[in-house]
């Protein structure tokens, strides 16, 4: 029974729309900014770096804490821990409170990676930074970092591979419009 409570809690934690909450407190309607997405990247488009950093931290933290709680209460049963990670991302992407219209899951995925392993986290962050600095597209950086984390897990952390493959597929699914925009040269670019 305890394991099922942890799984439900993972979805609920993931579904807390921190970016939307913190921007509303500042009088900003995130749905009317940039892409209209409720993730940390769109908070950055408001021009408020502090809010963007806070959104990134909080969205990552909920992924981390969901996995951490599962690790503590699921007797190191990998199945429940991995499902809790997926549910945290699903909660972020499809929050019940917002008619299942949420963010793209990248920051939450980062938090999950931190909970699992620092090596794969560093790979994710380094790839994200390199691609972002080279091309100035957050979406391309996110997709590249996610793909690299999935590939890394296949070669070096096989126990995480299926979980990260599922999360990666979800991240790509939520970025479908960005992928089309990238291919058409219409994607939003961050300038210095």
From Swiss-Prot:
Record membrane topology: Multi-pass membrane protein
Spans traversing the lipid bilayer: 5-25, 50-70, 78-98, 112-132, 153-173
Compartments (UniProt record): Cell membrane
BP GO annotations: phospholipid biosynthetic process
Reactions that this protein is recorded to catalyse: an acyl phosphate + sn-glycerol 3-phosphate = a 1-acyl-sn-glycero-3-phosphate + phosphate
Pathway the protein acts in: Lipid metabolism; phospholipid metabolism
Enzyme class of the recorded protein, top EC level: transferase
Its EC number(s): 2.3.1.275
Family indicated by similarity: Belongs to the PlsY family.
Subunit architecture: Probably interacts with PlsX.
HAMAP family: PlsY
Protein name (record): Glycerol-3-phosphate acyltransferase
High-level lineage: Bacteria, Pseudomonadati, Pseudomonadota, Alphaproteobacteria, Rickettsiales
């Amino acid at each position: 029974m305890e394991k099922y409570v942890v799984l439900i809690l993972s979805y609920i934690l993931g579904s807390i729309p921190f970016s939307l909450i913190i921007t509303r407190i500042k009088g900003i309607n995130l749905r009317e900014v940039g892409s209209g997405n409720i993730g940390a990247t769109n908070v950055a488009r408001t021009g408020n770096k502090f809010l963007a950093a806070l959104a990134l931290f909080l969205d990552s933290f909920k992924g981390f804490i969901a996995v951490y709680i599962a690790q503590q209460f699921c007797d190191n049963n990998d199945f429940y821990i991995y499902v809790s990670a997926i549910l945290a991302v699903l909660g972020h992407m499809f929050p019940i409170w917002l008619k299942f219209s949420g963010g793209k899951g990248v920051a939450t995925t980062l938090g999950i990676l931190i909970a699992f392993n620092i090596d794969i986290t560093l790979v994710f962050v380094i790839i994200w930074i390199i691609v972002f600095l080279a091309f100035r597209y957050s979406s391309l950086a996110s997709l590249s970092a996610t793909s690299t984390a999935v590939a890394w897990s296949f070669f070096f952390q096989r126990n995480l591979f299926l979980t990260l493959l599922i999360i990666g597929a979800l991240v790509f699914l939520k970025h479908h419009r960005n992928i089309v925009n990238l291919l058409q040269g219409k994607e939003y670019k961050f300038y210095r």
